[in-house]
């Protein structure tokens, strides 16, 4: 069983923002595999099903970004998963250029408050993550304002391709393993 968590903020106000690229990623996966999100448990929308022969739960925590760990910790208990082997968190990263993907087995939360919450609630940094580059804020723009801003029209035009690559990478993670996915998608 894989718990695939896309980070974001609930509500229409945040739907198309940079910070919600994690939500859009799991939505792309759900659409590709004919899965439907429902409010089911642990303050999360969940779409359960099979991807490449593996049971998955695609998750959009509805706790707001800074409290994502509450939902992830509750779902870890519900599904009885081992985070090091059965959890993948997908989220935005300011430190990567726009559209760049980076898979890792583990790591610090960095400056990402959603990841800080998850690490704090799980009590470990030992779980896989897929970071999606959103680039740096322009000029003197505050990072908090930037992540809550929408993508430019030029970036939005490229996002379907980026989200398709994210979905492809997740499919490889669940079917062939994290190392295979890292070898295939990190160099791009």
UniProtKB/Swiss-Prot annotation:
Site label Discriminates between blocked and unblocked aminoacyl-tRNA, positions: 9
Assembly and oligomerization: Monomer.
Protein family membership: Belongs to the PTH family.
UniProt name for this protein: Peptidyl-tRNA hydrolase
Enzyme type, top EC level: hydrolase
Primary role: Hydrolyzes ribosome-free peptidyl-tRNAs (with 1 or more amino acids incorporated), which drop off the ribosome during protein synthesis, or as a result of ribosome stalling.
SUPFAM superfamilies (UniProt xref): Peptidyl-tRNA hydrolase-like
InterPro entries from the UniProt entry: Pept_tRNA_hydro (IPR001328), Pept_tRNA_hydro_CS (IPR018171), Pept_tRNA_hydro_sf (IPR036416)
GO cellular component: cytoplasm
Keywords: Cytoplasm, Hydrolase, RNA-binding, tRNA-binding
Signal peptide annotation: none
Pfam families the UniProt entry points to: Pept_tRNA_hydro (PF01195)
PANTHER family: PEPTIDYL-TRNA HYDROLASE (PTHR17224:SF1)
Catalytic activity: an N-acyl-L-alpha-aminoacyl-tRNA + H2O = an N-acyl-L-amino acid + a tRNA + H(+)
Catalytic residues as annotated in Swiss-Prot or TrEMBL: 19 (proton acceptor)
One GO BP annotation of this record: protein quality control for misfolded or incompletely synthesized proteins
Main location: cytoplasm
Stabilizes the basic form of H active site to accept a proton, annotated site positions: 92
Native organism taxonomy: Bacteria, Bacillati, Chloroflexota, Chloroflexia, Chloroflexales
UniProt organism field: Chloroflexus aggregans (strain MD-66 / DSM 9485)
């Amino acid at each position: 069983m894989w718990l695939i968590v896309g980070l974001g903020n609930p509500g229409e106000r945040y739907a198309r923002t940079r910070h919600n690229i994690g939500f859009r990623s799991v939505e792309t996966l759900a659409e590709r595999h004919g899965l439907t999100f429902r409010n089911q448990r642990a303050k999360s929308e969940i779409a359960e099903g099979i991807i490449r022969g593996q049971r998955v739960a695609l998750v959009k925590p509805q706790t707001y970004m800074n409290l994502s760990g509450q939902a992830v910790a509750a779902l870890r208990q519900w599904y009885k998963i081992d985070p090091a082997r059965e959890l993948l968190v997908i989220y935005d990263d300011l430190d990567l250029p726009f559209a760049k993907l980076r898979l890792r087995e583990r790591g610090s939360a960095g400056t990402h408050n959603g990841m800080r919450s998850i690490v704090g609630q799980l009590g470990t940094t030992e779980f896989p993550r897929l970071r999606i580059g959103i680039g740096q804020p322009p000029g003197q723009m505050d990072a908090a304002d930037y992540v809550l801003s929408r993508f430019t029209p030029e970036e939005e035009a490229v996002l379907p391709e980026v989200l398709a690559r994210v979905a492809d990478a997740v499919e490889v993670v669940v079917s062939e393993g994290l190392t295979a996915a890292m070898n295939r998608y990190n160099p791009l």
